[in-house]
């Protein structure tokens, strides 16, 4: 288990020319620095409703860029890919978004697609650098769109999973 970085040490992390994250390429102190930037975004979402409104979108984008860690199982992969699809192609309707975990609850037959090597050019560092809540929301949406574009070869699968969510996710327990 990795050691968490303190909030004060996160403030000192900025995208630099050293220590690229092996998953997304962010230059912010390697994988630990990248995670620290993301963890700070999560903390900020608790204090600002505008940031909180796009937090799930940020989680899905980050998870898909760090699929080896956050999308190990077919269910976790499906949750994040379908979540991104829901947000970007189905308006991010809360009732649909929260139907995804209900759809994945229990025995669901899924085959995990191959993890992509190219997962987008924007990273958590681009969002972290946003000045103010409005810029943050805009950057999260751009980041998610960039990751979605990188997953173009799996978009039809995500849409099929969304159709399954819509067809059967609401009544499942």
Name every feature range the model reports, one short phrase each.
Residues 1-173:
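Intrinsically disordered, low-complexity linkers and terminal regions
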